[in-house]
Curated annotation (Swiss-Prot):
L-ornithine binds at N167, D231, S235, M236. Pathway: Amino-acid degradation; L-arginine degradation via ADI pathway; carbamoyl phosphate from L-arginine: step 2/2. Its main location: cytoplasm. Belongs to the aspartate/ornithine carbamoyltransferase superfamily. OTCase family. The keyword RNA-binding does not apply. This is Ornithine carbamoyltransferase. It catalyses: carbamoyl phosphate + L-ornithine = L-citrulline + phosphate + H(+). PROSITE patterns: CARBAMOYLTRANSFERASE (PS00097). Coiled coil: none annotated. Carbamoyl phosphate binds at S57, T58, R59, T60, Q84, R108, H135, P136, T137, Q138, C272, L273, R317.
């Protein structure tokens, strides 16, 4: 009998039910425990996994690679210079070729349509490692981290600070409300989430008992916050907008003043990384020299504070990605959830 996840792709949060998403989070926690105790879990023994990367990555590549190896699979990295998606070969043709050679495909790139075409034509599970619209594997790691810290998800309040229309904000809104988490977007009006994303999240919120708030008012945004979350001010492909974003988003920086507004000693801080919290990067130095800003979306004080959980969050990328690959490609018995 085919189990509920078998053969499915993982392209966007909206493709899964609340129960399915919760199952993947809990399954990831189980796999994390097995890893910590040194217990083998080779659910993908003999499988070959293609890792397609249009966009560069540290965490996503490392997480998929180690997760595949831990599961007994062989990962093969194909970077932007190795694949011809839509250039010399159509995505459809590439998908059909890769689907005959690999058992599963990860894609990290720009177009959501491209990852959907890979899933449509390859005949194997396809996992979205990030597109301009969605970042579903990040969400599993994020909400696993939240659950590890609070023991639950339902009824908590997560506040995202910064660019409210990027892929992380989209995914936090949809995944959070799906899971019963109140999601606040603290952003300038110019960068409020798209109306269709907000409406989608509001629909999930109505079903789960959560609520959605989109505001440019700091006091309103962080009231009752359990989680403060931020991301880089300039997404990949938007590097020419640094000056504009620095000026626009400086008031939305996560700093100790904002943390104190939440008035919650159990608050945690999350960041999907990389973070520009100092000048120890080329970008950091460049922004400091050009615009006089040494800390961008989060201050170094908060980044290194007792509230910070971003390195736990980064580790959880591996465990949650492992859960997705094992559930969709492994020959596991998973009853209907």
């Amino acid at each position: 009998m085919t189990q509920v996840f078998q053969g499915r792709s993982f392209l966007a949060e909206k493709d899964f039910t609340r129960e399915e998403f919760e199952y993947l989070i809990d399954f990831a926690a189980h796999l994390k425990d097995l890893k910590k105790r040194g217990i083998p879990h080779h659910y993908l023994e003999g499988k070959n996994i293609a890792l397609l990367f249009e966009k560069t990555s540290t965490r996503t590549r490392a997480a998929f690679t180690t997760a595949a190896i831990d599961l007994g699979a062989h990962p093969e990295y194909l970077g932007a210079n190795d694949i011809q998606l839509g250039k010399k070969e159509s995505t459809e043709d590439t998908a059909k070729v890769l689907g005959r050679m690999f058992d599963g495909i990860e894609f990290r790139g720009f177009s959501q349509r491209m990852v959907e075409e890979l899933a449509e034509f390859s005949g194997v599970p396809v996992w979205n490692g990030l597109t301009d619209e969605w970042h579903p594997t990040q969400m599993l790691a994020d909400y696993l981290t939240v659950k590890e810290n609070f023991g639950k998800l339902e009824g908590l309040t997560l506040v995202y600070c910064g660019d409210g229309r990027n892929n992380v904000a989209n995914s936090l809104l949809v995944a959070g409300t799906l899971l019963g988490v109140n999601v606040h977007i603290f952003s300038p009006k110019e960068l409020f989430p798209a109306e269709d994303i907000v409406k989608l999240a509001e629909g999930y919120a109505k079903a789960s008992g959560a609520h959605v708030l989109v505001t440019d008012n700091a006091d309103e945004a962080v009231k009752g916050a359990d989680v403060l979350y931020t991301d880089v001010w300039v997404s990949m492909g938007e590097e020419d907008k640094f000056e504009e974003r620095v000026k626009l988003l400086k008031p939305y920086q996560v700093n100790m003043e904002l943390v104190k507004k939440a008035d919650n000693d159990n608050l945690i801080f999350l960041h999907c990384l990389p973070a520009f919290h100092d000048t120890n990067t080329v970008y950091g130095k460049d922004v400091a020299e050009k615009f006089g800003v040494e800390e961008m979306e989060v201050t170094d004080e908060v980044f290194r504070s007792k509230y910070a959980r971003h390195f736990d969050q980064a580790e959880n990328r591996m465990h949650t990605i492992k859960a997705v690959m094992a559930a969709t490609l492994g020959n596991l018995f998973i009853p209907k959830v």
